[in-house]
Regions:
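"Short basic amphipathic alpha-helical interaction patches in structured regions
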Residues: 38, 47-52
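Extracytoplasmic loops and strand-loop junctions of Gram-negative outer membrane beta-barrel proteins
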Residues: 4-8, 42-44, 103-107, 134-135
């Protein structure tokens, strides 16, 4: 499942297990550049942190909040480290490649479920005191899919400490190469 500690060739869990990653961070005005080990939390890619060692990615991420009420993100991820591994590897679609559920070690154009180029970009606009924010996000998993996500979030303040939040999203994912990934999804949350 990619969630548990790895086992060695004897079926035993290693006696030590750890991971270390560094990130360069620079800030100019309301713009932030991060390069190195990243744990993104954006609509098109989200690092899993529900286990002892979190999933991490290696890449570059630029976040800009230079324009009032507008947040922009752009970046490229090239490698990933699963929660049950201490090794960087090509980014895998769902942690496994193909329908067989077997990990593949080589990244090739004929294996569209692995990539070293995951590009993302997105903007989110907060419409002032209206409680409404809208966003658009794009991702390109090189050789597998392109994804567009449009969302709207409305927050209704009930009192100073409570609010009701509605989130509506539409995602369209289209096949790139022969990945077999092609879908549309609508989701909502209250």
């Amino acid at each position: 499942t990619g969630l548990l500690l790895p086992k060695n060739h004897k079926g035993k869990v290693p006696s030590s297990y750890g991971s270390l990653g560094g990130t360069f961070k620079a800030r100019l005005s309301e713009n932030t550049l991060k390069a190195g080990t990243l744990m993104p939390k954006i609509p098109t890619v989200s690092s899993g942190d529900g286990r002892l060692i979190p999933q991490t990615f290696t890449g570059v991420h630029i976040n800009s909040q230079e324009i009032e009420n507008l947040t922009a993100n752009i970046g490229r991820l090239g490698r990933m480290k699963q929660r049950n591994s201490t090794n960087d590897a090509p980014i895998l679609l769902n942690g496994f490649s193909g329908n067989q559920g077997k990990r593949k070690n080589k990244s090739t154009r004929s294996n569209p479920t692995e990539t070293s180029k995951f590009d993302f970009a997105g903007v989110n606009y907060n419409w002032g005191d209206t409680g409404l924010s809208t966003g658009y996000n794009f991702a390109n998993f090189d050789g597998a899919y392109k994804q567009h996500i449009v969302n709207g979030v409305y927050t209704l303040a009930i009192d100073d400490s409570q609010s009701l939040k509605a989130d509506l999203r539409y995602a369209k994912t289209s096949e790139d190469a022969k990945s077999g990934i092609d879908n549309k999804a609508i989701s909502s949350m209250l």
